[in-house]
Amino acid sequence: MEPGRNINNLGGFYFMQEKQKKNVTTILKAAGSVVAVAAAAFLILVLVLTVTEFKPDSKETLDVGGNASGTLHEGDDFSIVTWNIGYGALGANADFFMDGGKHVSTADRKQVQTNIQAISGELKTLEPDAAFLQEVDLDSKRSHGINEQDAIVGEWKDSTYSFATNYKVLYVPYPIPTIGKVDCGILTLSGYEMENAERISLPCPFSYPVRIANLKRCLMVDRIPVEDSDRELVLVNLHLEAYDDGEGKAAQTKMLKQVLQDEVDKGNYVIAGGDFNQSFSNVDISMYPQISEDLWHPGCVDVDEFGSDLNFVTDNRTPSCRSLDQPYEGADPDHFQYYLIDGFIVSSNLTVDSVETQDLGFANSDHNPVLMKVTLGE
């Protein structure tokens, strides 16, 4: 063996080691730079979302739009529907990641338009005197920027309406792909003149920073004067907490109870309705069992806590909501997770004549509309 060659080989070995060290160092620096840029971008995003966070007051006066010629009297019949329309993107084809499904984007623009048109058409067919709608988008990525309020209100002639925002985020940064921009709320329509509308903030169960990209739930209170009477028909549209540990629902339900009781104590007629994300303890839901603990399951309102002045009303013959862990299209309807979480609370001076959940096969929303007819007591 030649000594010179051994020395040359040894030198080459050291040279290669140094080169590898430099390469590793370069890679680590590059990776560190990427992490630093990502961290900086995340912090900037959190800062922007913090500055632009939707922070409604505890009570806010809302605009009432439109014109209605109808007048209400004691002894009159009154019909009302509640419907969570799933921002026009949760039809029978949809599943959703928050319920165990796979998708964030659940409908293209054409599908959203088709769903909203069908929902508007069904409302015209039902011809209620008033409607409580939830998950109505004004300008959201998930519904392709369509103003669903304008689309629906445009089909209601001779009516008044009010809108309360409960979800407004410049950019929701999760999951991947992200939810993105959301501008959404609850909409009340009436064939009678509504004198005023008010947004009442409900307790938010989420702390910072999760709170900044989450819903800010509320009640929307509208008032219809009753002719030749000092009473009002008070309409309360609601959409209570869904994805919490249960404490949020409880706190919001407690506040709802107080708001309704205050109106009852004034002698007013009261109808509260919407998506409670809870069943009612006075309603048999055994026909809709929890088929898997892995799926979302609702809370339960103890109706006895509301006393005898307020009655809970829904129709258990048809489910009001379906799970979004899988599409409804192509699934076995006999082995599907259903819920009964939409309905009404009415004051005892109203006689409930009927309540019926419309079985629409969840074609255009993951909820079915619930129609109730009452008579105002004299």
Language-model-derived ranges and their functions:
Residues 2-13:
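Positively charged N-terminal leader segments that act as targeting/secretion signals
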Residues 17-150, 154-155, 163-174, 178-183, ...:
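N-terminal, active-site-proximal structural segment of metallo-dependent hydrolase catalytic domains
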Residues 79-85, 116-145, 189, 222-224, ...:
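Active-site beta-strand/loop signature of hydrolases that rely on acidic residues for catalysis
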Residues 87-88, 137-140, 166-170, 194-195, ...:
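Solvent-exposed loop/turn segments at secondary-structure junctions
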Residues 102-108, 136-138, 203-211, 239-247:
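Surface-exposed cleft-lining segments at the edges of enzyme active sites
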Residues 154-157, 181-197, 223-225, 332-351, ...:
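Conserved beta strand-loop-helix elements of the APE1-like EEP
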Residues 168-233, 237:
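A well-ordered secondary-structure block
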Residues 244-348:
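Metal-dependent phosphoesterases centered on the DNase I-like endonuclease/exonuclease/phosphatase
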